[in-house]
Each structure stands twice: as structure tokens, then as C-alpha cells.
Amino acid sequence: VPNRNKIFSSIIQSVALSIANETKSPVQIAMGIHAGDHAIYPDCRQEFRDADYKAFCEGNWDSERVSAYTPYLDVDKFDILKDGESCCECLGIDFDEVYKRTNTSYKPIKFFHTSTRWKWYSDYKSASSVERIEAFIKLGRPDPVAYADETGPVNWETAKIHAEELLYDWAVDKGRD
């Protein structure tokens, strides 16, 4: 999605500045942009974030009350998952319960399910899903999110094998360059 992080940051910057002005206190925006997206989305790079913040400051009075927190700017999804695992442990919450409720898929799939009527699943073939699956493989634990394809729900092993095959093919192709 071209320019998506600029769109998101514009919205959140305006909300944050409104809150900062109303409360007369600073507001920090947390953004989950990460290094894994740098090659695909230029608006995930530090240079873009700096330019975006400069434009925000130039266009708004009291903009210094708003700052950005981008803890994952230089790390990939694996490092984000490690941090999430650590945070869940510190907070005493179940990692799987948290992460089964997240969906990074650009192509979620909706299927009828007898107990819940309609249920949304993550696809496991899109680039964002493969990147997520790769991070869970590196972490050494199954991804608790529900996956599906055009035929219906699939288990973690199916999603994992598909991602591993794609990653292997990509590595082989990259070696030919």
C-alpha cells in the first residue's frame, strides 16, 4: 500500500497534537514500522520519518509537544516477536492469546464456521504472512493465528511448510544473481 505510513502518521499526528494541546502535555506516538519493510516501503526508513516529522512541525504550531517512538525501525519481525514474548512474560499474559488476535495479512480470508458463523483467517501466502511465519519459525514456536487458503482453514504445519519452501526458493534464486 503506497504511502500508507505517511497516511497513518498524518492521522495520528493530528490526533496526538489535539490531545497535547487539550491536556497541555507532551504526547508520544508509538509506531511499529520495522526494518523488514525498508526495501518494499520507503516510508519505513528513518530518512522518511525525519522528513515527515519536519513537515509536521513546519505545518503546525506547538508541534514540539508531539514526538514519535519507533523502537523497531532497525529490527525485523523476529526481533519484534522476541520483544513481544518478553513483554508478555513480564506482564504475566499469554503470548499465544495476544498473538492469535493479531493479523498481519494483506489478504485475510473469511469462512463460515459453525460455532461462530463467520470467522476471519490470515492467509499464509502473501509476503507479509510469509515474513510473519518466518519470524515464528526463527522464534521456535508455532504462530497461534488461524490460517486459511481458498479451500478453507489450514494448520500451522501447512503454513510453515509453504513459507519454508518460498524462503528456500528465494534464497536459491538470490544465489544465482
Residue positions per predicted region:
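Nucleotide-activated chemistry modules centered on ATP-dependent adenylation/adenylyltransferase
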Residues: 1-177
